[in-house]
Amino acid sequence: MKVTLDNINNSDTSIFGDWINNSDILSNEFINNKPYEHIIIKNFLNNKIANKISNEFPSDLSNYFKYNNPLEIKYAFDSIKDMTPDLKNVFYALCSNKVTDALKNITKKNNLDYDPTCHGGGLHIHENKGKLCMHLDYEKHPVLENKQRYLNIILYLTKDWKDEWGGATELWDENMKKCIKKSNVEFNSALIFKTSEKSWHGLPEPIQCPENIQRKSLAFYYLIPLENQSNVNKLGN
């Protein structure tokens, strides 16, 4: 999936919630949260667009790539040209200067920029028994030279998810001894966290949702110039 400048210039950043205009006050929470830098933003999008893209979220799994391996069981869809106009606009808006500047304010990383390849991003579905083992994302970008992933956004888009079904994104300590924080699957809330050599995360227990329910999420990433060489021991994409 390639994001072009024309797409970004035509994007509508009014789709976001109030946080977009109050990003400065979120920085301390992001920087000081444990086990590593992260923040959970509720009402990430305005309610109207959140409901629209949830309803438009493609559920036909024949169009998805299926991951079924020891690390993860999930479906991924990243063909932006085949998404609805509202879904496309969300991805384009995430690349806009307004959103990137807000994330710079939160992270205090002034050289932050969006990933134009959206590598590993897109729309994700976990069904019953879906999982994602604890892992570290890559740092060195596998496509873009001299770039590394710095920030990960996961936006939950399933309505009326029940906590007892599992599916929360777990954040573990750097020694992988225990879970420190859980980001529950709450509709229109976004987990934003720094990607590093200690940002262990995942949903390690198989999801126990009903067969007709899907855990739907949108993923997007931001990059910085390469600072660290890729760690060959890392797992993830």
What are these regions (language model features)?
Residues 2-6, 129-130, 137-149, 158-237:
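Catalytic core of Fe(II)/2-oxoglutarate
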Residues 40, 66, 113-118, 122, ...:
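A structural signal for short, well-ordered beta-strand segments and their strand-loop junctions
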Residues 152-154:
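Eukaryotic charged/polar low-complexity linker/IDR segments
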Residues 61-63, 111-113, 159-163:
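Proline-centered turn/helix-capping motifs that create local helix->coil transitions or kinks
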Residues 73-77, 106, 112-115, 119, ...:
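A structural signal for the main folded, soluble domain(s) of proteins
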Residues 55-58, 94-148:
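Non-heme Fe(II) oxygenase catalytic core, chiefly the N-lobe of the double-stranded beta-helix
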Residues 18-19, 25-107:
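Non-heme Fe(II)/2-oxoglutarate
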Residues 1-34, 236-237:
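Fe(II)/2-oxoglutarate
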